[in-house]
Amino acid sequence: MISSKSLDYTRFLPFFAALVRGHCLTVKSPTHNCGSGVKTIMDKSSIFLKNRYPISINRFVQQRKTFCGASVCLHKVLVQRQFGFEEKSHGLKYKKLFRRNIGTSEKKNRLPDLLELSSSPRRLPILFAAFCLLWGTCAVLAIQYGKQNSNVTQVVMYRVQHSKEAQDLLGSNIDFKYPFPWVPGKLHKRQGFIDINFEVSGSLASGTVHYQSQRFGPIAHWVELDCTLTSNGKTIKIPTGVSKDTQWT
């Protein structure tokens, strides 16, 4: 069987030119049927081309279905002009074949409308669950971003980086362990309570910093309860710097 890549379609141009001129439509079909008329023309066309073109029209039709639809419609139009056949069931079949081959790509590429998505009762719970999941993920990331960039976390991290005890335990270049650190705990400055911890790493080891502070009295005075660094089972206390650094506003 000859592949479609090696098939030269220009070899059939004289055949279609002959069809247009009417040289191949010399014998009328014995029955007034569009399908038999097309078959008669196909047979006569094969006889007309068998000496000059080794590939018959029937094998060419099997190679390319899309081109077959267009050629059959062309035969149908020529038969109607030559013999005056009426459009019957075969004509409707050829028309459907031609429309299916031409309009398939447009139907596949069409995006569904918003009403079609929302009208399906099965898709509504899935879309609602996906929306809730996306909203929850964005909310958690936003809260963690706020904790990471809060003045409490930045001041405590500054104290750890400049602490002599922390440098002896972790080494130099102390920073957050991950590019986007996870800061669990409570950071409620308005309610007067802070209890957070985050992971840090240096050139020698890594550890966990825990900070806890609470506000007492009507003057809104913050009291630091805990500020420690734990690494490899060893816990050290981070010294307090300037007193105003522990008064959170």
UniProtKB/Swiss-Prot annotation:
The keyword Membrane applies. Residues 145-249 are mitochondrial intermembrane. It is found in: Mitochondrion inner membrane. It is a single-pass membrane protein. GO terms for cellular component: mitochondrial inner membrane; mitochondrion. Its main location: mitochondrion. Disulfide bonds: none annotated. It holds the Pfam family Coa1. Keywords: Membrane, Mitochondrion, Mitochondrion inner membrane, Transmembrane, Transmembrane helix. GO terms for biological process: mitochondrial cytochrome c oxidase assembly. Residues 1-123 are mitochondrial matrix. InterPro entries: Coa1, Coa1_fungi. Required for efficient assembly of cytochrome c oxidase in the mitochondrial inner membrane. Involved in a step coupling MSS51-dependent cotranslational insertion of COX1 to the addition of its heme A and copper B cofactors. Belongs to the COA1 family. This is Cytochrome c oxidase assembly factor 1.
